[in-house]
Design a protein with these regions (language model features):
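GST-like domain detector, emphasizing the conserved glutathione-binding G-site
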Residues: 1-124
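Generic low-polarity alpha-helical segments
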Residues: 67, 157-158
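GST-like fold's C-terminal all-alpha helical module
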Residues: 97-157
Length: 159
């Protein structure tokens, strides 16, 4: 398998950790999606990373889809809990973590704009998402060691 990533991508990081946890052999290809001659646009119509290329040359993109695929082809260790309630909790944490990452990326992109075009309101809105997301995630960590269940699962990788 080959994994196309942009080195700073938090979404690629989740997939890389998942591949390591499952001990799946893979080759990492670092690409810059913003470059004119990027591989990414040829492999994903949205031009986004990460992209997993399977042994049969199938292109799987979006970190959530890739990790679901990995959990199906190598069942152990299980990244998504088997029971419905814990799976739903893990998916909720995944959504919060992705929202936090999205907000961080949007702040970074906003800060590289020309000074007079930077929107302080936009940045404040993204910072509020980050704060609220972290507050949500930390609300009951004082009483337990894991976000979901009493075992390692995808919720820890997301954070």
């Amino acid at each position: 398998m080959k994994l196309i990533i942009a080195a700073p991508s938090p979404y690629a990081r989740k997939v890389r950790v998942s591949l390591q946890e499952k001990k799946i052999d893979h080759e990492v290809i670092i690409d810059v999606p913003w470059n004119k001659n990027t591989l990414t646009k040829d492999k994903n119509p949205l031009g986004k990373v990460p992209i997993l290329i399977t042994k049969d040359k199938q292109h799987i993109f979006d970190s959530k889809v890739i990790i679901r695929y990995l959990d199906q082809i190598v069942p152990n260790p299980k990244l998504y809990p088997s029971d419905h309630e814990n799976e739903l909790s893990t998916l909720t944490i995944e959504a919060i973590a992705d929202g936090i990452c999205d907000a961080v990326v949007l702040i970074r992109l906003e800060n590289v704009r020309v000074n007079n075009l930077i929107s302080k309101q936009w940045i404040e809105r993204q910072e509020e998402k980050i704060f609220n997301g972290l507050k949500y995630l930390s609300k009951d960590l004082d009483s337990k060691n894991y976000f979901v269940d009493d075992d390692f699962n995808l919720s820890l990788i997301h954070i």
